[in-house]
Amino acid sequence: MTSGIKTYNGAVNVDAYGQHVIPIARTLQQQGFGIGVVSSVSISHATPACAYANNVTRADYQDISRDLLGLRSISHRFNPLPGVDVLLGAGWGADASRDNGQGNNFQPGNRFLAEEDFARINVANGGNYVVAVRQPGRSGSAVLMDAAWQAHQHGDRLFGYFGAQGGHLPYKTADGKYDSLNRRYSDADILENPSLAQMTRAALGVLSANPNGFWLMIEAGDVDWAAHSNNIDDAIGATFSGDDAFRMVTDWVEINDAWEDTVVIVTADHGHYFVLDQPETLAGPSASPDRS
């Protein structure tokens, strides 16, 4: 969708002949646009990856993160990509000692971002990104907004890394609570993570400083993950979270009177079937017939 070609399953902006193709975000970046990628799931999962990176397999998470963050990767060994201006998502705490789906340069630790890469991008170490990461006892929203303000003030890029178990933001269920049947979230999980809408707000705040305009991809990726799990409650809640993010975008456009210069596209990259093995439960308890 981002590069306008058909290719084999699992490819990230690589065509059927193994050649790199350029997604629209990189074309716009060459024209001076700011580029942002935001997701409720892992920072280098399929949709964030396809927004910007090149790789022969979507499973090569650490190398895809390198493309997104402007570091040397297996796909760009000698001339790394410029990197996106804003990258916000999950994957924090998702550690692994090995990952057979990734390449030989996989580093044990976080599956999606190697520790040395995380250190290298930080402005505190001479990198290009103000870093916001999940912190014990601190509001994730506050941590992210503080970093976004700093990035906006100093003209830096913004990287935000959050998440709970499973490599995504905590699921809000259909009733707006965090009471998923598949997972149990602690109070810390809820406090220390921003919502997708709050991530969207932070991204808009940083990217809007670019006078040339910007391209921003926002993914409610946990809708897909919940549907894969056949969990209607989580899927509905995740859809609502995506709707909140969409409203954040349209409110921003309204406040800035920017509809003449803005295109907002809402789409899905694929659909799902649900398997209802007990459809009668959706109707609730049945009433006994009145035989009088």
Give short role names for the model-derived ranges.
Residues 1-65, 74:
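Active-site nucleophile/metal-coordination loop of metallo-enzymes that catalyze phosphate/sulfate
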Residues 44-292:
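A post-motif C-terminal structural segment
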